[in-house]
A protein has these predicted regions:
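A short beta-strand micro-motif common to beta-rich folds, especially ectodomain repeats
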Residues: 91-108
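Hydrophobic residues positioned within well-ordered beta-strands of beta-sheet architectures
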Residues: 47-49, 78, 98, 115-117
């Protein structure tokens, strides 16, 4: 009985002890002195957090956050470092977020606890100081663009981000813009006599894509004097460029004191494509004071294709160009008719490639001249003044009348001179050609003045419907189709029409004698299938 009493007493004591122990176990306590953390993207400062707890704890956080400790027991002051969220000043980075999590409880307490601290880091936003406008919006922006295009400036502001082209968004009137065109006329180029090399200096050529989106640029009224080897146009030099879908007009006034080239749209085109452009207004020149080439073109002054260096060869193309500009051009002291003369071509003044690179051509295709030419220069044509080397004229038409007061010219309404590795195909002249100088001693032909090189690559589909008038009483080098066909190149499928007047009197031409009036032929046997169409 005594033993039973002792056991009951012991159990009672143990129960009391256990009850006492349960009452002494506290709840886990855990708190921090920050409810959130915000840090900068660049050079973020460290942050200290005071942890108060009666527990063992562990810490987790994003990989871009580095804590001073990841576990511990009881109170602690924790320091946090943050990785930069900045790459460079040109790169945008996104803001990022995460949380710092501290979990407590375990061996020291009976219950666990968790605290979280949201952490946010700012991103970096690049603000372009010169953001793209998507294109050229007005005349003021165009003025800025054309200066940048001719001086090597950034064109990003006017480049459409979807197409990568400089895009004209509206019609532009430049007449109210103050642009120093003379200052932009500083590009120079040099080449040897046969144009076997070409070096462009003092400028950064335009090498992009300009898309006029069929808008008009009016009020282009430069007055410029060119010095030695200088070239000038709305675009001084186009190199590996495309210029398309634009109409340009104004009064283009340019003269020279030395060898120079100018075109209303492009001064010099190298390995470039110029397509679907229209040129209007007026082209005026008092010529040059030098006995060196001064070529002006309605579209382009000087076009080049072929070898520039060991790593670059290329072609140049004019396609779908229409010139409506009226021309007044007095050659000044240069009244010669050779390669060093003052010259004008409705599409281009002078086009060439190196002799050794006949495969890479300058091509003028599907182009039309409607502008009349009132001039006093040794070479003048509605399409191209000089096809020097490696040039193709295909499907071109001249509708402009030429009145020329030069004493001794080489005049043709499509092209004046055609030479090495050049081709004429489907060339039509509807314009009249009048040489008005007393005692005129030069040549005049409806299509061309002179084809003298033995290695011309072909002539076919030549058609003249214009009237040829001259005071050259000899009349030897005056013809409906050409003045001087001085080679043996096969020429075929042509149409001879129009009229010839010599010293005011009309020359009788009919089905019976028209082959005598197509022009001088060194070898008549090489000319075949020429059809006579009586003029209306």
């Amino acid at each position: 009985m005594k033993n039973i009493f002792k056991s009951i007493l012991a159990l009672a004591c143990c129960g009391a002890i256990f009850a006492s122990c349960e009452q002494e176990v506290p709840e886990t306590e855990m708190s921090v002195d920050l409810t959130s953390i915000e840090v900068e993207a660049q050079n973020p400062e460290s942050v200290a957090v005071t942890l108060t707890t009666n527990a063992n704890w562990i810490l987790t956080c994003p990989d871009w956050v580095t804590p001073s400790a990841t576990y511990g027991s009881g109170d602690a002051i924790l320091s946090f470092q943050f990785a930069t969220n900045y790459k460079d000043e040109l790169t945008t980075t996104r803001a990022r977020s995460g949380e710092i999590k501290i979990s407590g409880g375990g061996s020291l307490t009976g219950k666990g606890a968790v605290v979280t601290i949201p952490v946010n880091q700012l991103g970096y936003t690049y603000v372009d100081p010169n953001p793209s406008l998507g294109g050229i919006t007005d005349a003021e922006e165009f003025a800025k663009f054309i200066v940048a295009a001719n001086t090597g400036g950034s064109l990003k502001r006017w480049t459409n981000e979807e197409t990568g082209e400089v895009l004209l968004l509206e019609d532009i009137d430049l007449s109210g813009e103050e642009i120093d065109w003379q200052a932009l006329a500083d590009a120079t180029k040099t080449s040897n006599a046969n144009n076997a090399s070409l070096v462009v200096e003092n400028t950064t050529p335009f090498e992009g894509v300009f898309n006029g989106d069929n808008h008009k640029i009016t009020g282009f009224n430069p007055v410029v004097v060119l010095g030695a080897n200088q070239t000038f146009g709305l675009f001084q030099v186009a190199h590996n460029a495309t210029i398309k879908n634009v109409e340009l007009s104004g009064t283009f006034n340019v003269t020279a004191t030395d060898q120079a080239d100018a075109g209303m749209l492009v001064g010099t085109a190298i390995h470039s494509t110029i397509s679907n452009v229209k040129i209007g207004g007026k082209i005026v020149s008092a010529g040059t004071t030098a006995s060196k080439r001064f070529s002006i073109g309605g579209v382009c002054g000087y076009a080049y294709a072929g070898v520039i260096s060991e790593t670059e060869v290329g072609k140049t193309l004019f396609e779908g160009c229409v010139v409506n500009a009226e021309v007044e051009f007095d050659g000044g002291t240069n009244q010669a008719n050779g390669a060093t003369s003052a010259m004008y071509g409705g599409i281009c003044g002078f086009a060439t490639t190196p002799n050794a690179d006949a495969a890479h051509k300058v091509t003028i295709k599907n182009c039309v001249n409607n502008g009349n030419m009132n001039v006093k220069i040794g070479r003048c044509s509605g399409i191209l003044a000089t096809a020097n080397t490696g040039v193709i004229l295909e499907d071109v038409t001249n509708n402009g009348d030429q009145v020329n007061n030069v004493a001794n010219g080489r005049l043709g309404n499509i092209v004046c001179n055609i030479s090495y590795y050049c081709t004429l195909k489907n060339c039509i002249n509807n314009g009249d050609l009048t040489a008005v100088a007393d005692g005129y001693k030069g040549t005049a032909g409806g299509i061309f003045a002179l084809a003298g090189a033995a290695n011309i690559t072909g002539m076919e589909g030549l058609e003249n419907y214009g009237t040829i008038k001259t005071l050259n009483t000899a009349g030897k080098y005056v013809g409906l189709l050409w003045a001087n066909h001085n080679n043996t190149i096969p020429t075929t499928n042509c149409v001879a029409s129009g009229r010839i007047f010599i010293d005011g009197a009309e020359v009788e031409i009919s089905e019976a004698n028209y082959m005598e009036k197509v022009g001088y032929m060194k070898d008549p046997s090489c000319v075949t299938n020429v059809r006579w169409v009586a003029p209306k």
